[in-house]
Amino acid sequence: MALPCSFSVALVLLSCHSLCCLACHLPDTHSLRNWRVLTLLGQMRRLSASSCDHYTTDFAFPKELFDGQRLQEAQALSVVHVMTQKVFHLFCTNTSSAPWNMTLLEELCSGLSEQLDDLDACPLQEAGLAETPLMHEDSTLRTYFQRISLYLQDRNHSPCAWEMVRAEIGRSFFSLTILQERVRRRK
C-alpha cells in the first residue's frame, strides 16, 4: 500500500512543479556546451590579430539584449535561441571559403547543433513567450548578423575577415553564456 501512496505523492509533486515552473529548464550539459563552444572558437584562431589590423571593424554588438536584469526568462531564452541559430548558420553553412581546421569546425557545429536541439525541445509557448513578443530583439540580432555577413562578403571571405568574425562571435557568445548563467542563477 505504501508504493501507490508514494507514487501519488510523486505525481502531485511533478504536477505542482510543472504548473509552478512554466519556464524551460535546459539540461546542465547545455551550459557546459556553451563553454566548449567558446573553447573551440578560441582554438580555431589561425591568424594573429595584429596581422589583420587593417580588417578591424565595429559590428555594433547589441549589448543591451544581453542584460540579464532587463530580460524575463522567456525573453532571454528567445535571445539565446536566435543567437545560437545565427552562429550555427554563420559557421556551419558558410564553410566553403572559411580557413578553419575542419576537425574543430565539425566539433563546433556538432556542439551548436546539440544546443539547438536542447532549445528546440523547449517550446517557447511553454516558456511564457506567447505573451512576450520579441520583434525588437529578433530584428536587432538579425541586423547584427547581417552586418557580419556583409562584412565577410565585402572582404571576399578572406582569412583575415573570418578571423575578425571569429573573434567577434567569441565575444558575443561569451555574453550569451553569461546571460544564460544569470538567468539560471535567478531560478
Curated annotation (Swiss-Prot):
SMART domains (UniProt xref): IFabd
Localisation: Secreted
Signal peptide span: 1-23
Family annotation (Pfam families): Interferon
Keywords: Antiviral defense, Cytokine, Disulfide bond, Glycoprotein, Secreted, Signal
Disulfide bond annotation, renumbered to this chain: C24-C122, C52-C160
GO BP of this protein: adaptive immune response; B cell activation involved in immune response; defense response to virus; humoral immune response; natural killer cell activation involved in immune response; response to exogenous dsRNA; T cell activation involved in immune response; type I interferon-mediated signaling pathway
Top-rank taxon: Eukaryota
InterPro entries: 4_helix_cytokine-like_core, Interferon_alpha/beta/delta
Glycosylation sites recorded in the entry for this protein: N94, N101
Ranges in a coiled coil: none
Summary of the function given for this chain in its UniProt record: Produced by macrophages, IFN-alpha have antiviral activities. Interferon stimulates the production of two enzymes: a protein kinase and an oligoadenylate synthetase.
Protein name: Interferon alpha-3
Source organism: Canis lupus familiaris (Dog)
